[in-house]
Amino acid sequence: KAEPKKVGAILKVKGNKYKVTKSKVKGSTVEFTGYTNKKKKKVTIPESITVQGVEYDVTSIGEKAFSNCKKLTLLEIKTKKLTKKTVAKKTFKSIRKKTVIKVPKSKYKAYKKVLRARGLNKKVKIKK
């Protein structure tokens, strides 16, 4: 039987790093904390990840998730579970002005507000 990792455990999936925020057999969640290759140009934050048979919903983004991301040109956010409370204060402060952020259509208005409130430069394009 698949056992979820403990709260605080760091998981690496497809070049992204996550921290377990809730550990249950059903309903485990993780926070996107960054990515391993800082030269990566495209980063996708998925709706969920699966590690050793356990599914974790991606529900938050950590404060330093995008620090030192000088090469990033496209950030695709697929999860629909982000809120102002689940995105750390200065998360998007260091994202370059040329970066394009793609968000789910149904969350465009809400995410635009959240991302700007969390330090995203007004020159960064947000697309549906």
Which positions does each model-derived feature cover?
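Short, surface-exposed terminal/edge motifs of secreted or surface/virion proteins that either
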Residues: 111-115
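Short, surface-exposed basic-aromatic patches at helix termini and helix-loop junctions that form
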Residues: 93, 116-118
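Structural signature of tandem-repeat unit edges
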Residues: 25-30, 38-60, 69-86, 96-110, ...
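Intrinsically disordered, low-complexity repeat and linker tracts
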Residues: 1-21, 32, 119-128
